Curated annotation (Swiss-Prot):
S-adenosyl-L-methionine binds at G60, W62, D80, D96, D120. It catalyses: uridine(2552) in 23S rRNA + S-adenosyl-L-methionine = 2'-O-methyluridine(2552) in 23S rRNA + S-adenosyl-L-homocysteine + H(+). GO terms for cellular component: cytoplasm. It comes from the Bacteria. Specifically methylates the uridine in position 2552 of 23S rRNA at the 2'-O position of the ribose in the fully assembled 50S ribosomal subunit. This is Ribosomal RNA large subunit methyltransferase E. It comes from Acidithiobacillus ferrooxidans (strain ATCC 23270 / DSM 14882 / CIP 104768 / NCIMB 8455).
């Protein structure tokens, strides 16, 4: 099937992108790695020995950055519906986080909860702005739901947020559960994109779905 002119234009722009070229040279799977590296440099959110859940992790750019920072004394779980190649010192789980079996697998890998949950999830774009924005906010809310399930008191949540309808409501929800929200726009984010990265710090809520002793609880 022949590519459309718009897809050809996107591919040309993509491969000319300096962060894409740098990722290829330095062995990262995605230009998104540099977004997390910049946030880490500014905020020092990932530390040795932490327990981290990377939601929507494929192809693994953020997982690659986080694994050596956490080290072998910590735990890093990367989950995505899409297949993902292994990353050293990380547990990769392939499946939908709405699936009970996948939730159980995450629980087994992180039995004591998570110190940090991070998500670089974005929807497959339809080209219809209102639809795409709603889907993007849904994914950010999914990451917040994961925080309610597994984040320990004092933990942090890092999410991608596309500014637009629903973003302010999401901000209010985060403020109910966290003491502070830091907003970042990394250099690797394309200037025309409305994406921001929100780092919510010092979780004040209670993880509702964590199975500390093998028994189930419900919302």
């Amino acid at each position: 099937m022949a590519r459309s002119k718009s897809s050809e234009k996107w591919l040309k722009e993509h491969f000319k992108d300096p962060f894409v070229q740098r990722a290829m040279k330095e062995g990262y799977r995605s230009r998104a790695s540099y977004k997390l590296l910049e946030i880490q440099q500014k905020d020092h959110l990932i530390r040795p020995g932490m327990r981290v859940l990377d939601v929507g992790a494929a192809p693994g750019g953020w997982t690659q950055v986080a694994a050596p920072l956490i080290g072998r004394k910590g735990r890093l779980v990367a989950v995505d519906r899409l297949a993902m190649d292994p990353v050293a010192d990380a547990t990769v789980i392939c499946g939908d986080v709405y699936d009970d079996a996948i939730l159980a697998a995450c629980q087994e890998a992180l039995p004591g909860g998570a110190d940090l949950i991070m998500s670089d999830m974005a929807p497959n774009m339809s080209g219809i702005a209102s639809v795409d924005q709603a889907r993007a906010i849904d994914l950010a809310e999914l990451a917040l739901d994961m925080a309610h399930r597994w984040l320990v008191p004092g933990g942090a949540l890092l999410i991608k947020v596309f500014m637009g309808s629903g973003a302010e409501e999401l901000r209010r929800a985060l403020r109910r559960d966290f003491k502070k929200i830091v907003v970042r726009k990394p250099e690797a984010s394309r200037a025309r994109s409305t994406e921001q990265y929100w780092l919510a710090l010092d979780f004040q809520g209670v993880a509702q779905e964590r199975l500390d002793n093998g028994g189930a609880s419900s919302l």
